């Protein structure tokens, strides 16, 4: 995918369907953010009476015989002193939606004068590119006649030296290939995206990139490894479980290793603790953690980062059936820790627990980061725009938070309240898989933390239940799967681990 280009000269630009012109807002009025020809000023001067330049505001106009582009979009960037990476990202995402609805395929974007801003040309370009790429996406549909919006096919940013712009654009395009993979997997029917399909995608990545190796464990191998928690969740499903291990060696001589774990429940009925219909209808997205890990590995291998990363995906359906695991029963995990089942709808933490145990036994991790659509309690706490995360290591937490703020993928650190751990007490097992009806996201994280046992490994748990999937478009994300987490984690690993 090559979509974005840069060009220093305004006069030498190619003809395009549309032109995007940037504006600041000053004293509640629009102020030009770049110098343009008088021919264009004549087109938009009357429109400025109803256009203030506030962030994300757009005005769609038609050109004339004197303009090279016949469609013109005025784009508000807000007050220059308040512009941030996130506002740039969301503004150009909004512009992309407007352009696609107008059926534009080729677009010229005039780069604003930003010498007075607090961040660099590179940062502005990165967020501009991310905004365009994020909304230049269609989720899979099954209509007889395709009703999807046409894609932008070529976007040229003018006023930027190609050597600078094109390097940033190629990187963002590689990154968004991973984001799109994550979105497509989450958006596709659960009948298609089974555990075996996730394994096939992992194999496909390993076939595409020589730096990746893959290992797939089937049910027999899962039982041989004594992953009794994953095996329990898989008991009721007609589809076979898989335990997927991806390995990326970007720095073979280094002992530093990051393990990424993604919850891969390809459909969650709740098991015998059956979900109500309204809560179940979106449960094809319960494998978003697994999809996030696969998207990260796609980008990681494409960008060739000099780090070592292992990805682990425990994958199964949580189905109902005569063989399904039952509430009140006790199952034993890989390391011998036993769990009393208080709810079969708290299955994600069970399969993640066996994945954590596997990572500690075989991968010698420096840090473990897991991704899971784990708790509705997190959605209640932070909504759909912010993912909560837990960490047992302040450096890891600080670095993730910084990467989050620099990519616009919002994370908020949540507390691991030690005294809440007692809510997991069981009289007949080492623990229950649910606590009380309070602090649900915290007790879920405390459950996972127990499986670190005495290992001092740095660990973070990202509960992406609210951010992975939106039932309406929310900038800078499209409707449905967002791909949240791919950009943040790649940026984290590049900035803090690629040394």
UniProtKB/Swiss-Prot annotation:
Its main location: cytoplasm. It is found in: Cytoplasm. Binds 2 manganese ions per subunit. The active site is at residues 275, 349. InterPro entries: Leucine_aapep/pepB, Macro_dom-like, Peptidase_M17_C, Peptidase_M17_leu_NH2_pept, Peptidase_M17_N. Keywords: Aminopeptidase, Cytoplasm, Hydrolase, Manganese, Metal-binding, Protease. Mn(2+) 1 binds at residues 268, 345, 347. Its EC number is 3.4.11.1, 3.4.11.10. It catalyses: Release of an N-terminal amino acid, Xaa-|-Yaa-, in which Xaa is preferably Leu, but may be other amino acids including Pro although not Arg or Lys, and Yaa may be Pro. Amino acid amides and methyl esters are also readily hydrolyzed, but rates on arylamides are exceedingly low; Release of an N-terminal amino acid, preferentially leucine, but not glutamic or aspartic acids. GO terms for biological process: proteolysis. Its cofactor is Mn(2+). Mn(2+) 2 binds at residues 263, 268, 286, 347. GO terms for molecular function: manganese ion binding; metalloaminopeptidase activity. It comes from the Bacteria. One of its GO terms (cellular component) is cytoplasm. Presumably involved in the processing and regular turnover of intracellular proteins. Catalyzes the removal of unsubstituted N-terminal amino acids from various peptides. Belongs to the peptidase M17 family. This is Probable cytosol aminopeptidase. The lineage of its organism: Bacteria, Pseudomonadati, Chlamydiota, Chlamydiia, Chlamydiales. The gene is pepA.
């Amino acid at each position: 995918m090559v979509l974005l280009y840069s060009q220093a000269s305004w006069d030498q630009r190619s003809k395009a369907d549309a032109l995007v012109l940037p504006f600041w807002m000053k004293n509640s009025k629009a102020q030009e953010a770049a110098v343009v020809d008088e021919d264009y000023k004549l087109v938009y001067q009357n429109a400025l009476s109803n256009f203030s330049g506030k962030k994300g505001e757009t005005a769609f106009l038609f050109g004339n015989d004197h303009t090279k582009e016949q469609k013109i979009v005025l784009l508000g960037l807000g007050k220059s002193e308040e512009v941030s990476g996130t506002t740039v990202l969301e503004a150009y995402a909004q512009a992309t939606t407007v352009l696609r609805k107008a059926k534009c395929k080729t677009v010229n974007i005039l780069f604003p004068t930003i010498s007075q801003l607090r961040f660099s040309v590179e940062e502005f370009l990165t967020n501009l590119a991310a905004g365009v790429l994020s909304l230049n996406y269609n989720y899979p549909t099954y209509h007889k006649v395709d009703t999807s919006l046409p894609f932008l096919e070529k976007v040229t940013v003018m006023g930027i030296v190609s050597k600078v712009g094109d390097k940033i654009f190629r990187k963002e395009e590689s990154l968004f290939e991973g984001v799109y993979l994550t979105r497509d997997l989450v958006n596709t029917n659960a009948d298609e995206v089974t555990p075996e399909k996730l394994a096939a995608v992992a194999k496909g990545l390993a076939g595409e990139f020589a730096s990746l190796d893959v290992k797939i464990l089937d049910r027999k191998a899962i039982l041989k490894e004594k992953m009794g928690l994953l095996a329990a969740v898989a008991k009721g499903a007609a589809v076979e479980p898989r335990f997927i291990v991806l390995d990326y060696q970007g720095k073979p001589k280094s002992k530093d290793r990051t393990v990424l774990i993604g919850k891969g429940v390809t459909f969650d009925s709740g098991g015998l603790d059956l979900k109500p219909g309204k809560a179940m209808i979106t449960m094809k997205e319960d494998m978003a953690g697994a999809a996030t890990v696969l998207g990260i590995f796609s980008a990681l291998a494409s960008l060739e980062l000099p780090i070592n990363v292992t990805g682990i995906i425990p994958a199964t359906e949580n189905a109902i059936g005569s063989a399904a695991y039952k509430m009140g029963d006790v199952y034993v995990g890989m390391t011998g820790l036993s769990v009393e089942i208080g709810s079969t709808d708290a299955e994600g933490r069970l399969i993640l627990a066996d994945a954590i145990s596997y990572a500690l036994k075989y991968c010698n991790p420096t840090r473990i980061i897991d991704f899971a659509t784990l708790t509705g309690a997190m959605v209640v706490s932070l909504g759909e725009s912010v993912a909560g995360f837990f960490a047992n290591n302040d450096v890891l937490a600080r670095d993730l938070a910084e990467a989050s703020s620099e990519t616009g993928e919002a994370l908020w650190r949540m507390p691991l309240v030690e005294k809440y751990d007692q809510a997991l007490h069981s009289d007949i097992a080492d623990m229950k898989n649910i606590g009380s009806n309070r602090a649900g996201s915290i007790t879920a994280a405390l459950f996972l933390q127990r499986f670190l046992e005495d290992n001092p490994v740095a660990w973070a748990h990202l509960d992406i239940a609210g951010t992975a999937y939106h039932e309406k478009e929310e900038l800078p994300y499209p409707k449905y799967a967002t791909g949240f987490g791919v950009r943040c984690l790649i940026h984290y690993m590049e900035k803090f681990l690629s040394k």
